[in-house]
From Swiss-Prot:
Protein name as annotated: UPF0637 protein LVIS_1261
Signal peptide residues on this chain, from the entry's feature table: none
Pfam family, one: DUF1054
Similarity section: Belongs to the UPF0637 family.
Organism: Levilactobacillus brevis (strain ATCC 367 / BCRC 12310 / CIP 105137 / JCM 1170 / LMG 11437 / NCIMB 947 / NCTC 947) (Lactobacillus brevis)
Coiled coil: none
Length: 199
């Protein structure tokens, strides 16, 4: 489903052109992924709502990335722990994120069990800035502890997930295998997401 040619939408340097290509080529695939993830997200036992990026604030420069987010609110996701799946011009990403807009960010992150974080596969990364495609670092104890120390800063962010670079096997495998990789990645993050949204 997701293919190398999907990255070509970012070669259009006009706002209208890139938005049109995103809406026509990528957004429908995001919705298919959302449907495919419904059984996985149902394991959280709370309603999860999808939010396809609209890029409404863009008036001049075309978006440098595009995504679909999943959160516990119909109204939005940036102020809540959420899952984000999307594209930069050179990679496909799957992140569990707590952004700077989140209420009580440090309190939420205090609910996360370190053992569960370190049990994630070695292909996972941690990051500190959703607006920086290069923010991901290997998910090691040292890197994760450094990420947690940053959380005292007002504008700190927290991400766990995976990046799949353009040209990687994800884009040459069968659609079924690709969907399974995405499902497995999200499923691996669910125990931590569950901790973040616990009352």
């Amino acid at each position: 489903m997701y293919q190398d040619q999907d990255f070509q939408v970012f070669e259009d340097q006009t706002l209208a052109g890139r938005l049109g290509k995103i809406q026509k080529q990528i957004d429908p695939k995001f919705l298919i992924t959302a449907g495919d993830l419904e059984p996985v997200l149902a394991e959280l036992s709370v309603p999860i709502y999808q939010h396809v990026s609209q890029h409404r604030r863009r008036t001049k420069n075309p978006p440098t990335d595009t995504w679909i987010a999943f959160s516990t609110s119909k109204r939005g996701y940036k102020m809540l722990p959420h899952l984000e799946i999307g594209f930069w011009d050179d990679r496909f990403f799957i992140w569990l994120a707590v952004l700077q807009e989140a209420k009580n960010r440090q309190g939420l992150l205090g609910q996360v069990q370190l053992a569960d974080v370190l049990n994630l596969p070695s292909t996972f990364e941690c990051g500190n800035d959703h607006a920086d495609k290069n923010c991901g670092r290997p998910l090691t104890l040292t890197n994760y502890q450094a990420l947690m120390r940053e959380q005292v800063n007002r504008h700190a962010e927290w991400q766990l997930g995976r990046n799949f670079m353009r040209g990687s096997d994800l884009f040459t495998t069968t659609p079924d295998d690709q969907a399974a990789i995405i499902r497995d990645t999200v499923a691996a993050l669910l125990p931590i997401y569950r901790q973040l949204i616990a009352d």
